[in-house]
Amino acid sequence: MRHAHKKAKTKGSGGYFKTGEARGHHLQDGLARGYRFGFTAGSESHDGRPSRPIVHGPYVIAETDFLAPPGVTGVWAERFTRDGIFDALRARRCYGTTGARMIVRFSLGETPMGGEVTASALSGPAEFSARIIGTAPISACELVKNNREIDRAGGGATELNATLRDREAAKPGDYYYLRVTQADGEMAWASPIFVT
């Protein structure tokens, strides 16, 4: 066992970290390629503990500087049951944060985050609703279209209700998501709304 730990420390456990940092392996790259997925956040630190799991117990963790506290996934479930939560995840009615327990709502009319709307159903420029309850003042709430910021709101309060607009007509293949930044640096991302 000791030999395996030493090998992992000196050789690493594979190319996972480097591969994940390579160009083309990011969430935005997948969206640009047409993949449709919801945003979640979390970690896998092998100890099965939620929240901030780095605890020095009977096992020695020689290097912890590459470990970060896990994120938090929020879901908008119709039922507070196991099936209801998984239904919300499958429907992409979810968001991820860097760890702050924010509440994030994002919609385009009646279409919630993760949903799909046809371009023909939109009459003119799209108006999105954002409702955020932060754990610190909200410094920015950004509407991102096809990986580019197109509108922004903020104001410094811990709660924000905002209407964000796309000044151009949406077309099939477009996608929009919400990116929230608090004054303390914590962030959240709401799953995209996809235009078909």
Identify the role of each PLM range.
Residues 1-19, 23-196:
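C-terminal functional module detector
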